[in-house]
A protein has these predicted regions:
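Glycine-rich, Lys/Arg-enriched anion-binding loops that position phosphate/diphosphate groups
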Residues: 1-4, 17, 24-109, 113-114, ...
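Phosphate/ribose-recognition catalytic cores of enzymes acting on nucleotide-derived substrates
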Residues: 100-155
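Active-site flanking residues adjacent to catalytic metal/cofactor-binding acidic residues
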Residues: 21-23, 148
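Proline-aspartate-enriched helix->loop->beta-strand connector
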Residues: 8-19
Length: 155
């Protein structure tokens, strides 16, 4: 967060645009909130999360994945889709959705889950039931590489 204010404050450009990717959804929301709260004249442009052909969220970190680790990393998006499908079939309890996602991720050896969270898509507040748009966010270490991914449900 300090980086964007350090860049903006000394320059004071007349029009300042900044692109932040939706892949790190939490960071994007926090930066948008900071820009609003501090009344910076900055337009934040959300960069769409782009997936590679195999479903892995595009990231420079993917270059560190061996072919074996890349195969394992596919479970992140599969697990997000599983959570979304369960939601679309009527499940609204966050605890059940998270358990299904974790179980799916744990089915692949060599994937160390750091977190699986489902939060309000606008505020990132903790929720017990999904009643409006929410973000499913996951982070895991595959091999030596930390990967993050997310998907929005309820839109």
């Amino acid at each position: 967060m300090r980086g964007i204010s350090n860049l903006h404050l000394p320059l004071r450009p007349p029009q300042f645009l900044a692109v932040f990717g939706e892949k790190d959804y939490q960071q994007l929301l926090l930066i948008e909130k900071m820009v609003e709260d501090l009344n910076f004249d900055i337009e934040i442009i959300p960069g769409t999360l782009v997936r590679e052909e195999d479903g892995i969220a595009m990231s420079s970190r993917n270059a560190y994945l061996s072919s074996e680790d890349r195969e394992k990393a596919k479970v992140l998006y599969r697990s997000l889709r599983k959570g979304k499908e369960l939601f679309e079939s009527g499940e609204r309890r966050v605890s059940i959705l998270i358990k299904a996602i974790r179980d799916n991720m744990e089915s692949v050896n060599g994937v160390l889950i750091q977190y699986v969270e489902i939060k309000d898509a606008e505020t990132l507040a903790r929720i017990e039931n999904v009643s409006k748009p929410a973000v499913i966010a996951i982070a895991a270490i595959v091999g030596l590489t930390r990967l993050i991914d997310n998907i929005i449900i309820g839109r």
